[in-house]
A protein has these predicted regions:
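Glycine/small-residue-rich loop that forms an oxyanion/phosphate-binding "nest" at active or ligand-binding sites
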Residues: 55-113, 118
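Active-site-proximal loop/helix segments of hydrolase catalytic cores
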Residues: 113-179
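Binuclear metal-ion centers of metallo-dependent hydrolases, dominated by the metallo-beta-lactamase
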Residues: 67, 79-93, 175, 179-226
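Pre-active-site segment of Zn-dependent metallo-hydrolases
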Residues: 12-50, 55-62, 73, 109-120, ...
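Active-site environment of divalent metal-dependent phosphoester hydrolases
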Residues: 29, 50-55, 75-78, 92-95, ...
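Zn-dependent metallo-beta-lactamase
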Residues: 1-19, 26-29, 102, 203-211, ...
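Beta-strand-turn-beta hairpins that frame and shape the catalytic cleft
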Residues: 1, 14-20, 93-102, 130-136, ...
């Protein structure tokens, strides 16, 4: 399994012949490592309804004939815009040709803007992806919560965790999350996109590594093998 960080909370996962895009916010993202029109994928996983996660999902899905997997209400929203979708709910899993996707809890909100109103579209979620003999956890946007210990029972090869604070957990809580999840490797995300979520990724990694974890902050465009 290869993982490419595309900025904010967006990642491209390559496993076997599958190309899986997670939380595709590229257009309007000052840290984006690629343009939306250059993305090639066959599946898109979306954690929740906020624009900095749904971003280019429909446009990329239509261009690539890719399947969008998201919570049920969000999947229906994407389907109404002409995308192919598969809806899940937290705790539910489904086997796809590339592997299994399970949605987990996340403590956050999940809305899309509709003029002056926010329309809520189901529960925010984390994503467990099992493919190619590896297990990846994308936490989505979330606060720290005790049930992360249950997610850790999935024997995680990698965890992608927000550290930006303000809208999600910050570095202090992310360190506790690492204790709960016990991944072999963690990558911080959802930080330094805007001043309000500015954090020192290398400093977070040093503290985590000193505590016995393996954390690798990636720059947008960097790739690693899990």
């Amino acid at each position: 399994m290869h993982l490419t960080y595309l900025g904010h909370s967006c990642f491209l996962v390559e496993t076997g012949s599958a190309r899986i895009l997670i939380d595709p916010f590229l257009t309007g993202n000052p840290t984006a490592a690629m343009k939306a029109e250059d993305i090639r994928c066959d599946t898109i996983l979306v954690s929740h309804g906020h624009e900095d996660h749904t971003g280019d999902a429909v446009a990329i899905a239509k261009r690539n004939d890719a399947l969008i997997v998201a919570n049920y209400e969000l999947a229906e929203y994407f389907a109404a815009k002409g995308a192919r979708t598969h809806g899940l709910n937290p705790g539910g899993a489904h086997a796809f040709p590339f592997g299994k996707v399970k949605l987990t809890l996340a403590h956050h909100s999940s809305s899309v803007e509709a003029g002056l109103n926010a329309v809520y579209l189901g529960s925010p979620c984390g994503i467990l992806l099992q493919a190619g003999g590896k297990t990846l956890y994308h936490a989505g946007d979330t606060a720290l919560f005790l049930d992360m210990q249950l997610i850790g029972r999935a024997n995680l090869d990698a965890a992608l965790l927000p550290i930006g604070d303000n809208y999600t957990m910050g570095p202090e809580d992310a360190l506790v999350a690492l204790d709960f999840l016990k991944p072999r490797l963690a990558v911080p995300m959802h930080y330094n996109t805007w001043p309000l979520i500015a954090q020192d990724g290398p400093a977070f990694a040093r503290r985590a590594n000193e505590a016995g974890h393996t954390v690798l902050p990636l720059k947008p465009g960097e790739k690693l093998e899990i």
